[in-house]
Amino acid sequence: MIIDLVKRPVITEKATRILEKNQYTFDVELSLTKPKIKALIEKAFKVEVVSVNTHRPPRRKRRLGTTQGYLPRYKRAIITLKRGFMIPLTPF
């Protein structure tokens, strides 16, 4: 399902700043490629995607008592939409 692959929108200071340029930021499944991300976003939100930029943030350590591990990996995608399209980020 699309919901499982596109995990959540990112609401950070930078993500809200680039909303003015019609760019949206999502955390997506690590195995997705740029063409797959583009197809998923266009299908899910019925918008036209101009470009997709991705990056993989560094792993973060998590500690619970004496046990140490890492948080699961993810990929962050910055989606640029065609002028006139928008994605609602509020819950329905």
From Swiss-Prot:
Molecular function via GO: rRNA binding; structural constituent of ribosome
Biological process, per Gene Ontology: translation
Highest rank taxon of the organism: Eukaryota
UniProt keyword annotation of Ribonucleoprotein present: yes
Cellular compartments per GO CC: chloroplast; ribonucleoprotein complex; ribosome
UniProt entry keywords in alphabetical sequence: Chloroplast, Plastid, Ribonucleoprotein, Ribosomal protein, RNA-binding, rRNA-binding
Subunit: Part of the 50S ribosomal subunit.
Stated family: Belongs to the universal ribosomal protein uL23 family.
The protein's name: Large ribosomal subunit protein uL23c
Gene name for this UniProt entry: rpl23
